[in-house]
């Protein structure tokens, strides 16, 4: 499921309670601690996304493992940072300015001037002439 679909607000708190086996008070408590951020309707009702439900289930699992709120916050923060690092790494696959300068410098050294053909072009051109 795409990320934009997973973050769409769909579920009222009653459905989330059934899905997670958490009480409304527990869910509101996690919201107060900024662990989940449900969207509010015009009538001020909470609507939770798939991501919110996943996070609540993860919180429940961490509680079952014996972690307290501070530990849960650390685990979720580390997981979020790791996810962001992966996204940043994927986005920065482009060539850096330093690498680009090095490639251009090498190319200019091979050609000597802008008007001459590079050695690479010369090597390739012999196959076509």
UniProtKB/Swiss-Prot annotation:
Residues 13-32 bind DNA. One of its GO terms (biological process) is negative regulation of DNA-templated transcription. SMART domains: HTH_MERR (SM00422). One of its GO terms (molecular function) is DNA binding. Residues 10-78 form the HTH merR-type domain. Keywords: DNA-binding, Repressor, Transcription, Transcription regulation. Under conditions of nitrogen excess, the DNA binding activity of GlnR is activated by a transient interaction with feedback-inhibited GlnA. Under conditions of nitrogen-limited, GlnR is autoinhibited by its C-terminal region. InterPro entries: DNA-bd_dom_put_sf, MerR-type_HTH_dom, MerR_fam. Induction: Under conditions of nitrogen-limited growth, repressed by TnrA. Transcription repressor during nitrogen excess. On the contrary of the MerR members, which require longer DNA sites for high-affinity binding, GlnR requires a DNA sequence of 17 nucleotides as minimal binding site. Homodimer under conditions of nitrogen excess. Monomer under conditions of nitrogen-limited. Interacts with feedback-inhibited GlnA in order to stabilizes GlnR-DNA complex. The amino acid sequences of the N-terminal DNA binding domains of TnrA and GlnR are highly similar, and both proteins bind to DNA sequences with a common consensus sequence. In contrast, the C-terminal signal transduction domains of TnrA and GlnR have no homology. This is HTH-type transcriptional regulator GlnR. It comes from Bacillus cereus (strain ATCC 14579 / DSM 31 / CCUG 7414 / JCM 2152 / NBRC 15305 / NCIMB 9373 / NCTC 2599 / NRRL B-3711).
């Amino acid at each position: 499921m795409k990320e934009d679909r997973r973050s769409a607000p769909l579920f009222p708190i009653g459905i989330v309670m059934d899905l997670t086996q958490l009480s409304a008070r527990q869910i509101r408590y996690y919201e107060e601690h900024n662990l989940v951020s449900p969207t509010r309707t015009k009538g001020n009702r909470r609507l939770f996304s798939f991501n919110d439900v996943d996070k609540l289930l993860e919180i429940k699992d961490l509680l079952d493992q014996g972690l307290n709120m501070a530990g849960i916050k650390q685990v979720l923060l580390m997981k979020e940072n790791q996810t962001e690092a992966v996204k940043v790494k994927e986005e920065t696959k482009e060539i850096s300015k330093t690498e680009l300068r090095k490639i251009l410098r090498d190319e200019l050294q091979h050609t000597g001037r802008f008007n001459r053909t590079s050695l690479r072009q010369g090597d390739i051109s012999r196959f076509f002439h």
